[in-house]
C-alpha cells in the first residue's frame, strides 16, 4: 500500500529509500547494514548532508570540517549550551580569595578543527630566530675542500673577498685612430711619474733620533740596510746617511768613519772633486766632527735615491734580490752592459791619476734603468796613508773587475776562479768567457782597457746605442708635458682677473670691454655645449686652445656669451695681447 506524499506519519520518500510493496529480503538487509557503516559522500564534499534527517541511509556522525562562520559556535558549544543548568554558587567567596594568585593553566585546549581562511599574523623575531648576517662563516662561499681543516672544527671567521680573483680581467685597450688621443697620453706616463715620485719621497725622509744638524747638513736618515756596524776594508767602522744641504737644498750622502782622526790632504780632496764621470759617484767634501761624541770623519757624496747595490740585487737573498734560484742566471746582454760601464769608469779613474781600490759588488750602485755607479772612490785615497804604488793598484783593479763579473755570472762569491771559469764556459758564449778570463787570469801581461774595448767592440755596440734610444724616449715624454707649465701660467692669469673683478667696481669703458672678453674666453674654454645642450668635457680641446693662445696665432674664433646675445670674432693673438694687458693692469692697481 502506498503512502500519501504529505503524510506526517511516514518519512519523505527519497531516491535512495523508496517504499516497496514486497518485504525486505536478506540481501537488502545486508546492503542497508553496509550503508550504515559508510560515511556519507556529502559530508566529505560539502561538510553536511541536507538529507541526514530525511532518510539518508549513510552514516553522518563522522568528523567534518565546519565553515568559518560555524567554527566559533562549535568551539564554545559546550561552554554556552542553552540546555545546560544555570550556574549556582554554593556560597560567597571568602575575603582572602581576593588576594589569591592568578590562575595559570598548565596547558591550553587546542581546537579540534582548523579554519580554511588564512589570517595574517605579525611575526616577532624570537630568541631562536636565525640572523643570516650574524654568522660570518655563512657569508664566505668556499666550494672547494679545505685540507688544512680536516681534523679541526671550522672557526667562525670572516675573510674579505679577494676582488682581484673574482673580478674579470679588463678588456684590452682598443686601437686608436691616428687623430685620437687618451688623457694619459697628454701627460707623463705612470711608470716614469711613479719612479720620479719615489725618488722625491726618498730624498725627504728624516729620522728624529739622529742629530738635527751637522755643519751645514740637516735632515739625516740612515741608508745602511744592515742594523749592525760593519768595518770597511779601510779599517774603520762606517755608517751611511742621507742628508740635505742648507746651502743649496740638495740631498747628499754623508759617510761617517768612526774614530778616524787622520789628517786630510787638501790637495787630494781638490783633485777628487774634479773626478766627474757618469758611472762614478761624485765626491764633494771631507771634514771632521764631534757631533757623534767622537772624532768622526765625514765624507760627502752625491745622493741617488731608489738605488741598490749589485751585491744586494743579485748575490744576497734579501727582499730586493732577484736572483734567489740556483739555476737562474743573469742574461748575457745585461752582463755585457755592466762590463762595459765598469770598464769605461775604471779607464777614466786611471787616466785621472787614481785607482778604484778594492772594487766589490757592494760598492757598485744600480738603478732601475741598469745604470751603475761606483761609490766610495775617495775613501781609500783619503784615509789610507801607506798605499801601494798606483800601478800596482791599477793592476789589482783589473783582477777585481773580472772577479765581480764572475760573481754575477755564477751568482756566488765563495767560488774559486777556476770553478767559476768552468761554469761560465758552460753557460755563456765563448767571447764572454774570454773577456772574463782576460781579467782573472794570472798571466803576467800588461792589461790595457782600451785594447780590451777594441777587441770586444762588437759586443759593446748594442750597449752604446741603448742610451740614445732611452734619451729619445724621455725627450718625447718631456715634449708632451713641457708646455703644461705655460698653460698653468695662462690659467692663473685668467682666474686672477675674473676673481678680482667680481665685485662691482667702476672701470673705464675700454677696460670693461677687455674684461668682458676674458669672461667670454673663460666660457669658450670651459663652457662648451653641443647641439643637445649637453656640456662638452674635452681635455684635449682645452689644451689645444691654450696652446694656440700661448702661441698667439692669427686664427679667428667666435666668442659667444652664455645667453647667446653677444658674439665677438677675435683672433688668438689679440686675446693674448688683451690678457697680458689686463693682467699687467691688475698688478699695477
Curated annotation (Swiss-Prot):
GO molecular function, one term: poly(A) binding
Chain residue ranges for the region called Disordered: 1-32
InterPro entries: Kinase-like_dom_sf, PAN3, Pan3_PK, Prot_kinase_dom, Znf_CCCH
Residue spans, zinc finger C3H1-type: 34-63
Cellular localization per UniProt: Cytoplasm; Nucleus
Primary location: cytoplasm
Knob domain, as annotated region: 497-589
GO cellular component, one term: nucleus
GO BP, sorted A to Z: mRNA processing; nuclear-transcribed mRNA poly(A) tail shortening
Motif (PABPC-interacting motif-2 (PAM-2)): 74-94
Residue ranges that the Swiss-Prot or TrEMBL entry lists as coiled coil: 458-496
Keywords per UniProt: ATP-binding, Coiled coil, Cytoplasm, Metal-binding, mRNA processing, Nucleotide-binding, Nucleus, Zinc, Zinc-finger
Source superkingdom: Eukaryota
Segments of this protein annotated with the region Pseudokinase domain: 201-457
Amino-acid positions noted as binding ATP in the UniProt annotation, renumbered to this chain: 255, 302-309
UniProt free text on domains: The N-terminal zinc finger binds to poly(A) RNA.
Protein role: Regulatory subunit of the poly(A)-nuclease (PAN) deadenylation complex, one of two cytoplasmic mRNA deadenylases involved in mRNA turnover. PAN specifically shortens poly(A) tails of RNA and the activity is stimulated by poly(A)-binding protein pab1. PAN deadenylation is followed by rapid degradation of the shortened mRNA tails by the CCR4-NOT complex. Deadenylated mRNAs are then degraded by two alternative mechanisms, namely exosome-mediated 3'-5' exonucleolytic degradation, or deadenylation-dependent mRNA decaping and subsequent 5'-3' exonucleolytic degradation by xrn1.
Subunit: Homodimer. Forms a heterotrimer with a catalytic subunit pan2 to form the poly(A)-nuclease (PAN) deadenylation complex. Interacts (via PAM-2 motif) with poly(A)-binding protein pab1 (via PABC domain), conferring substrate specificity of the enzyme complex.
HAMAP family: PAN3 (MF_03181)
PANTHER family reported in the protein's UniProt record: DEADENYLATION COMPLEX SUBUNIT PAN3, PAN2-PAN3 DEADENYLATION COMPLEX SUBUNIT PAN3
Similarity section: Belongs to the protein kinase superfamily. PAN3 family.
Name assigned to this protein: PAN2-PAN3 deadenylation complex subunit pan3
Organism of derivation: Schizosaccharomyces pombe (strain 972 / ATCC 24843) (Fission yeast)
Organism phylogeny: Eukaryota, Fungi, Dikarya, Ascomycota, Taphrinomycotina
